[in-house]
Curated annotation (Swiss-Prot):
The keyword Transmembrane does not apply. GO terms for biological process: catabolic process. Belongs to the acetaldehyde dehydrogenase family. InterPro entries: Acetaldehyde_dehydrogenase (IPR003361), Acetylaldehyde_DH_C (IPR015426), NAD(P)-bd_dom_sf (IPR036291), Semialdehyde_DH_NAD-bd (IPR000534). The active site is at C128 (acyl-thioester intermediate). This is Acetaldehyde dehydrogenase. Keywords: Aromatic hydrocarbons catabolism, NAD, Oxidoreductase. The lineage of its organism: Bacteria, Bacillati, Bacillota, Clostridia, Eubacteriales. Its EC number is 1.2.1.10.
Amino acid sequence: MGKQRLNAAIIGPGNIGTDLMYKILRRSEYLELKLVAGIVAESEGLRLAREEGVATSAAGIQAILDRKDIDIVFDATTAHAHAQHAPLLKDAGIIAVDLTPAAVGPYVMPVVNLEEHIDAMNVNLITCGGQATIPIVYAISRVVPTAYAEIVATIASKSAGPGTRQNIDEFTLTTAKGIVDIGNAQKGKAIILLNPADPPMMMNNTIYALIDQVDPAIEQKITESVEEIIKEVQAFVPGYKLKIPPMFDGNKVTVMIEVEGSGDYLPQYSGNLDLETCAALAVAEKMAKHKLAAGAN
């Protein structure tokens, strides 16, 4: 009988890495979390991992490479760090699920294009704003050609840790590229806003699209397409909600999405981070299931 699970590791035990740890431990069917690695021995993330009985190391990427038993790594560090980690993981034959905006590997979105990249050795989760909004752009553009799409992701300032703040330029560029490459808009733009309101607000996303054709039948098809993709995202992100359904003003379509977090480790207002970790787990589970099935044949 072949392996039942792949051995997983997390590098980067910050907000995202720690939330992901709890999701793997509580929900994963195909992953066994073997290691959480960081670079600060006394960090909160490593302490919490030890409390859960998971091995930890402050030796960073080297700790993963030294073990020889890791099949898949979630990189929740920074875009700059992942650019250094990616070739090392590739040479070691370890699958990388990249939660930074580094975009070394292809962009993946569970409800849009994961099957195309199921055998890839490095996949990129785009950004939290991308995971929230690109499915909507895709839902519109599969009905009618979309000349331009712009997204505004507004997140609670408290949910933006140092990694998110360091990556803001990469966030806007990577999300805009994803709007074109995955959302199929001809041009894309992304804006991120950090809202300091207290109590913190839920993640809100506004999607604007300029479409090539307009008539009542197309409007109806777009509305149905958006509703359909929202149900697909909700299968792995229960807090993903349609706040304002498609509104049409000439050839401009506006949609608003709210994301409430699952509350595994992060507060519920951190829907932006929860969306990224939910998507990462959904991607890794499908990749692991595929790899395990291939190994059993």
